[in-house]
Amino acid sequence: MRTVLVALLALVALTQAISPLDLIKEEWHTYKLQHRKNYANEVEERFRMKIFNENRHKIAKHNQLFAQGKVSYKLGLNKYADMLHHEFKETMNGYNHTLRQLMRERTGLVGATYIPPAHVTVPKSVDWREHGAVTGVKDQGHCGSCWAFSSTGALEGQHFRKAGVLVSLSEQNLVDCSTKYGNNGCNGGLMDNAFRYIKDNGGIDTEKSYPYEGIDDSCHFNKATIGATDTGFVDIPEGDEEKMKKAVATMGPVSVAIDASHESFQLYSEGVYNEPECDEQNLDHGVLVVGYGTDESGMDYWLVKNSWGTTWGEQGYIKMARNQNNQCGIATASSYPTV
């Protein structure tokens, strides 16, 4: 009995001897292993650890509010938790809303206007993953090619609805080959430009035949390995969430642009993302709406597929607030290709 007591006292003493700094270092070590982080030198690692620790405190503070029911989503130490926020935005967010407006003014090229079907009652919730119309979550890496992933996702869904086969399409094909249409590879682009390129090009290659590299490369499109094509695209009326809901329900996954410029988006983990600071015109990131619904608390949301891998958000997805005055501009620039 005395031996057991001594052992317990020793364990307590050891626990008390572990400093907060030791715990942070252990958490940092686990984080690096989990996300396969490697840094150029010790100076960079110290810099990244400092950012990680600052984000760690921000996340803990925010998640206390979540536990108290004051916010509707949680944050987490994902693979971007060691990046400065401005560094993250410059690297990951590649949608150029200003370019979209300029191109429309200069060229007059717009898609067909979406007209919702008459006398159709849409379901209260939709998830196109359940119908087999959505490929697995992909990862754009450190390349501002979000627009390409949003484009392929929408066309993958439309091709599935028409042909009954889900084919993963090549984002790299769009990155390398659609510059003449106003896209800039890893430096950003537009989904509508991608749809125009695919139409004029006679198709887009499969991901298998033209795999993703995450860099700007020369175009090596091969018409022998085309996976899908489109005949144009449809623009959903700007800011109209109800029409976008009908489009998602009746037509399939929809390409959208959003304001993802906030730290809360960078570190999002789970729940319904409700960010009052979002701007409906400051659009900087292309994603894919694959459904919609209402959570247990009665909060409406859009089900959104991102292109940052499965370790971000809810296995690569985010639920974004719906019917909150077009929050984050989710219905400002929405479209889908026609096939």
From Swiss-Prot:
Query: What is known about its subunit structure?
Result: Dimer of a heavy and a light chain linked by disulfide bonds.
Q: What does this protein do?
A: Important for the overall degradation of proteins in lysosomes. Required for differentiation of imaginal disks.
Glycosylated residue positions: N96
Q: Which family does it belong to?
A: Belongs to the peptidase C1 family.
- In short, the EC number is 3.4.22.15
> Mind telling me what this protein is named?
Cathepsin L
Q: Where in the cell is it found?
A: Lysosome
Gene Ontology cellular-component terms for this entry are:
lysosome
Arranged from A to Z, the UniProt key words for this protein are:
Developmental protein, Differentiation, Disulfide bond, Glycoprotein, Hydrolase, Lysosome, Protease, Signal, Thiol protease, Zymogen
Residues of the propeptide region, as annotated, are 18-121, 295-298
What InterPro entries does this protein map onto? Papain-like_cys_pep_sf, Pept_asp_AS, Pept_cys_AS, Pept_his_AS, Peptidase_C1A, Peptidase_C1A_C, Peptidase_C1A_papain-like, Prot_inhib_I29
Signal peptide extent: 1-17
An example GO biological process term is: proteolysis
Q: Which residues form the active site?
A: C146, H285, N306
One annotated GO molecular function is: cysteine-type endopeptidase activity
| PROSITE patterns xref list | THIOL_PROTEASE_ASN, THIOL_PROTEASE_CYS, THIOL_PROTEASE_HIS
Reaction(s) this enzyme catalyzes, per UniProt: Specificity close to that of papain. As compared to cathepsin B, cathepsin L exhibits higher activity toward protein substrates, but has little activity on Z-Arg-Arg-NHMec, and no peptidyl-dipeptidase activity
The disulfide bridges present are C143-C186, C177-C219, C278-C328
